[in-house]
Amino acid sequence: MSLEGIGFGYRERAPYASNPAFSRGRLVPEPESPTRTPFQRDRDRIIHSTAFRRLKHKTQVFIAHEGDHYRTRLTHTIEVAQIARALARALRLDEDLAEAVALVHDFGHTPFGHTGEDALNERMENFGGFDHNAQSLRIVTKLEHRYADFDGLNLSWETLEGLVKHNGPLLGPYAAHPDIPVPQPILDFNARYDLELSRFASLEAQCAAIADDIAYNAHDIDDGLRAGLLTLESLDEVPLAKRLLDIVRTRYPNLDPVRTGHELVRRQITIMVEDVIEEAQRRLASARPGTMEDVHNQPRALVGFSDAMRAEEKVLKRFLFKNLYFHESVVVRRHAADRIVQDLFDACFTDPSLMPDEWRLGCEALDKAALARRVADYLAGMTDNYAVREHRRLFDRTPDLA
């Protein structure tokens, strides 16, 4: 693998990269900007949205108010965007599109992370379920109210298809999860604006997807060490982490544990990024796509870990699930968060007048399914802090998340 020239100066765009000059456009046509490409405008709209600001107070692993230095959805999103841009630059892709997809990929997450999503999905079981990826699409196509000419952000086709399919096709022979039904909100929007759900997304979207894995694999270690739920000694159980820690300990024999942990994290990010670049170059050389259309028609993703790194990453994930995500102290908080979300849903579904005016107006005309979706939209947009405050306002006792 050659890294020569990567990250320095101008490198010609690859023929299989997404080209903003040939964007498929937007659902609602708009005049082109004289100063920004369509993908740059998408990125800017995402950053200026209300949903983006809310990520600041939404959980990554630890409840947002547990400490100022733990990752939230916002800090995680920024880290994913940085890695996605680096990968796109190395592969001569459109960095702005990769960044836009990375910045928007977690918009649909509920308060309290996957716990909140599971709680809402349980309450929505008879009304189409709840899926954070589908909710991201609803936010950027309907729920953001900023522009006079349309609801949502009216993002370009390329950013929308990257958002929906960054983890792979949803339909057809190459579907990433063929046994899981496609969420109805995605199918409904796709009927209006065909995102080609059976084909792979752009390479830029694939960069955003693998950047997500790289970011949380490394940074959950960082947060786990900070919280005292993981130790450097326990990480010796993970072959990849042990190899990197051995390098750090040999080079810096007297380094304090905090800096040792940071050195592990930065090295893990680097080795994973370089693995993805090398593997993507190998797959591209084999597939020889000549255009972006060739990328969409591939039978597999072209950006991803090598088989060896994927195997090591699976070991790391098993370790994190056992020792961090299902640590007793994390599970206790998850039970409390689950109750908060389900209590709020039950209360608002039974009495929509408990919701703010913008959400309760018109509820009397909705059937049960539409009302449930309205309540889910309201709750999904909450931050951790707001959900706790609303629960305290409506209930005599609120579970302790401290």
Curated annotation (Swiss-Prot):
**Where is the HD domain positioned along the sequence?**
73-217
Q: Where is this region: Disordered?
A: 20-39
What domain of life does the UniProt record list for this protein's source? Bacteria
Q: Name one GO molecular function term.
A: dGTPase activity
Pfam families linked: HD, HD_assoc
GO BP terms: namely:
dGTP catabolic process
* Keyword line: Hydrolase
Stored HAMAP family: dGTPase_type2 (MF_01212)
Q: Which family does it belong to?
A: Belongs to the dGTPase family. Type 2 subfamily.
Which NCBIfam families would you find in this protein's record?
Answer: dGTP_triPase, HDIG, PRK01286.1-1, PRK01286.1-3
Name of the protein this chain belongs to: Deoxyguanosinetriphosphate triphosphohydrolase-like protein
Which organism is this entry from? Brucella ovis (strain ATCC 25840 / 63/290 / NCTC 10512)
